[in-house]
Amino acid sequence: MSSALLEEVGWDADFAIPVANAENKALEEQIRKKQKDILNLDNKLNKHKDVINALTEHLKNLKQEVSHNQALCKAKEKETESEVHLKALAERETGRLKQEITRLESQLTTLNEKKNAQENSIFKATQKIDELTSQLNWDQQTLEAFLQESAHKDEDTMAIIKYAKQDERKIKELTLNIEKLTLESNQKRKTLDNELTETVTSQIALDKTAESFRQAHTERQELISQWENTIEQMRKRDQDIQQCAMMLAELNQTIREKNDLIKERKDFLEREIENNKELERNIGTVERQAFRLRQQLQEEEKNQRRLQDEVEVLKGTVDRTATDVETSRSQLSSMKKDIQDKTTKVEEAQLHNAALEEKLRMVTEAVLNGEEQAAQMEQLLREQEQNIKEIDSQLLRQKELLFKKSQEVQALRDKEKNVTAEICATRTALSNLDSKLRKLDQNFLQQQMIISNQDFQIQMLERKTLHLQGKVNTEEKKALEKKVADLAASLEEKKKTAANLNKQLKKLQDDIRCIKKDTEKIGAEKTNLSTKIQEVELFIETSEKERKKSRLKKQDSMVEKGLLKMEVQRLRNLLYDRADGVLTLEKRRLQLQTAMKEREEEIRVHREMLNKQVKLTEQERQGLSAAVNEAMSKIDKQRKRYEVLSVSLAPPEGEEDKSQAYFIIKAAQEKEELQRKGDELDAKIRKTEKEIHALENTLQVVNNCNSTHRKALTKVTESSPAHQEKLKLEEQRRAAEEKYKYKRRQTQELQEDIESMSNTLEGLLQEEKVLNEGIERTQAHVLSLNKDILSQEEKINRAVKQCAKYTKEIRSGKQSTEKTFEERDIELRELRDFNKSINKMLLDAMEGNPELSSILQIHFTQAGLSLPSPSSTPSSRLSSKPSSARSSASLHRSSNLSASSSPRSQSVSSPQMKTVDLGLGLSVTSPRGSQPSSAGSSRSSSKCKSP
C-alpha cells in the first residue's frame, strides 16, 4: 500500500522511505482506531437502516392493513347505514301506506256516505218521480174527468198547466242533477281505479327493488367476507415477509461483519508488512545510530573523566579558598582588636611622620626634578600597562577556553537531551565550578598584580633609599636607618592595618555590589513581573469580555439554532403533511376509483334492472289500462244493457232497487280496487324514477370528484403555482439547513475558542500564582538584602569617616590643602577610564544603530575630535587598566561583558588607586580590586578627594 502511494507521489527509490515519528504513529494508530470505530458505526448504521427499512415495510403493511380494516369498517358502516336506510324507507313506506290506507278508508267512507246519500237522494227522487208519474197519471185521469166535467173552467185549467210546467222543470233539473252526479261518480271511480292500478304497480316495483336490495346486501356480505379472508391472508403474508426481512437483516449484518473482519485482517496484514519493513529500516538506522552513539559515548566518557579531574582540582581550590576565607575572617576579628591598639600608635606615628614627610619633601624636591618624576611615572605606567596586557591576554585565553568549554557543554547538551537527572546535576555543578574557577582566576591574577605592584614599589623605594644613602653622612645615615627601621616597623603595622581595612572594605564593597546587582535584578524582575501581571490582568479582562461576548453569541446562536430547529421542524412537518396528504389523496383516489367502479357497476346493474322494471311496469300499465278501458267499455255496455233490460224487464220495485244498488256497489268496489292498484303502481314508478334521478346525481358527483382527483394527480407543470410554491419551500428548507449548519459550525468554533481561552486563562492563573509566589520570595529576599545593605552602609560610613580622617591627617602632615600628585594621577586615570568607557558605549551604539555613525562623525568633527574606531577598543581597553585596582575592575567588567556593558556599571566599577607618601621617599600604592589589601585604600582615596 505504501509502495503504491510512493509510486503515485513519484518517490525516488534511491532515497529511504520516510518513516513517521512517535507522534505521527500515535496519530496513525488513532486514525486506525477511528476508522475501525467508523466501520463499526457504519455496520451499526446499516443494521439500523435494515431494521428501519423492515419496520417501514412492516409499517406500510400495517398501514395498508389498517386502511383495509378501515375500508372494511366503512363497508360495514355503509352496510348498516344502507340497512338502516332501507329500514327507514320501509318504515316510511309503511307509514305512508298506512296514511294512504287511512286516507283511502276515510275517502272510502266519505264516498260510501256520499254514495248512500246520493243513492238515498236518487231513491227519493225516483220515488218522487214515481209519485209524480203516478200523480201525473192520476192527474191526467182526473184532468180528463175534470175536462170532461169542467171544460168551461179555463182559469183552473191554466193553473193546472202552470203547475204541470213547473213540475216538469223540476223533473228536468232533478234529472240533470242525477246525470251530473252519475258522471262525477264515474270520474271518481275512474280516478280510484287509476290509483289502484298505480298502487299495485308501485307495490310490485317496491317488491322487486326490495328483492334486488336483498340480493345486493347478500352479495355485499359475501364480498365483505371475501375481503376479510384476503385481509387475513395479507396479514399472514406480512408476518411472513417481516420474518423474512428480519432474517435478511441478520444475514446482511453477519455478511457485513464478516466483510469488515476480512477487511480488518487485510488491513492488519498490510500494516504488519509495512511495520516489518519499517522495523527493518528502523533497525538499520538504530544500529547505525547505536554505533555513532557508542563512539560518542566513548568520547563523552573521556570528556567526563577529564572534567571530573578538573572538578576534583576545582574542589581542592574551593576547599583552599574556604580555609583562606575562614582564616581571613579570624584575622579580621583579631585585626579589629589590633586596630584599637594601633590607632593610638598611629596618632603618635603621625606626629613623627609629619616631620619626616617635611624632610622627605625637601629631599625629594632637591633630588628629583619634574622630568625625572615624569620619567618615573611613565616607566611606572608602561610597566603597569605591560602587566595589564599580560593579564588581558591571560583573560582572553581564559575566555577562549571558557567559550570552548561552553560550546562543548552546549554540544553535549544538544546531544544528550534524554540523559538522566544525574548528568543535569553534574552540568549545573560544572557551571558553578566554572564560575568559581573564573573567580579564582580573577583572584589569582589580582594577587599577581598586587605582588608585581608591591615588587615595583619596593624597587622604587630601594632606589630612593640608595640615592639618599649616597648623599648623607654616617650619623645621619645611622639616624635615618634607625628611623627607616622604625618607619618600616610602623609601615608594616600600617600595612597590616591597611590590609585588614582593605579586606573589610573590599568585602563590604563586594557585598554592596552584589546587593546592588541583586536589587537591580530584583527590581528588573519586579518591573517585569508587574508588567507581566498587568498584561495578564489585561488579558484576563479582555478574555473575560470575549468570554462574555462569546457567551452572548453562544446564547444568540442557541436561540437562533432553536428557531432554526423549530423552522426546520415546521417545514419538515409541513412537508410530511403534504406527503401524507398526497399519499392519503392517492389512497383516496384508488379507493374512490374502486368504489366508483363498483358503484358504476351497481348503478349499471340497477339501471338495467330499473329499465327492465320500467318496461315491465309500462307493459303492465298498458295492459292494465287496456283492461280498464275494456272493463269500462264493458261496464258501459253492461250499464246500457242493464238500463235497457231494466226498462224492458221492469222488475218489481223492491227487487229492482236491490239489484241496482248491489250491482252499483259491486262495480264501484271493483273500480276502487283497480284504482288502488293503479295508484300503487304509479307510486312505485314515481319512486323508481326519483331513485334513478338520485343515482344519476350521485354518479355526476362521483364523476366530478374523479375529475378533480385526476386533475390533482396529473403531473404538475413548472409554470404552475403549486410547483413554484414547492420550489420556494425547498429553497427555504435548503437555506434554513445551510444556516443551521453554519450556526452549528460557528457554535462549535466558539466552544473551541472558549475552551482554549479557559485553558489559557487557567495557565495564566497558574503563572500568576507562580509569579506571586516568586514575588513574595523576592520581596522577602529584598527585605533581607535591605537589612544587609543598611548594616553594610553603616560599616561603609564608618570606613568613609576613617578614610576622610586619614586624608586630613595626610594633607595636614604635608601641610597642603590642595590635591596631592597621587590624587591628580588617580583623577587622570579615572578620566581616561571614563573616556574609554564612553568610546566603548558609542561603538556599541554604532554597532546597534549604524545610522548614528554619520551623526556622531559630524559632532566629533565640529568639536575637533576624532571618532573612535573599533580597532582601537582593545588597546584602549587594555590601556585603561594601569593599576592592579583597575585590573580587578576590568576583570569584573570582562566577566559581565556577556550580560551588558553600560557606562553606569563601568563607572561604578572604575578603578581608583591611592599612593600614600610617607615623607621618606616611600610610597604605597593601594589599588581597588577584589583583594582586601587594595579595596580599602582605593575606597578611602575616592572618598578623600574633597575633604
Curated annotation (Swiss-Prot):
InterPro entries recorded: CCDC39
Instruction: Decide whether keyword S-adenosyl-L-methionine is in the record.
Output: no
| Compartments where found | Cytoplasm, Cytoskeleton, Cilium axoneme
Q: Which residue intervals are annotated with compositional bias (Low complexity) in the record?
A: 866-911, 926-947
Q: Where is this region: Disordered?
A: 866-947
What does the UniProt keyword field contain? Cell projection, Ciliopathy, Cilium, Coiled coil, Cytoplasm, Cytoskeleton, Primary ciliary dyskinesia
Role summary: Required for assembly of dynein regulatory complex (DRC) and inner dynein arm (IDA) complexes, which are responsible for ciliary beat regulation, thereby playing a central role in motility in cilia and flagella. Probably acts together with ccdc40 to form a molecular ruler that determines the 96 nanometer (nm) repeat length and arrangements of components in cilia and flagella. Not required for outer dynein arm complexes assembly.
Report the sequence similarity comment from the record: Belongs to the CCDC39 family.
Give the protein name, as stated in the record: Coiled-coil domain-containing protein 39
Q: Source species, please?
A: Danio rerio
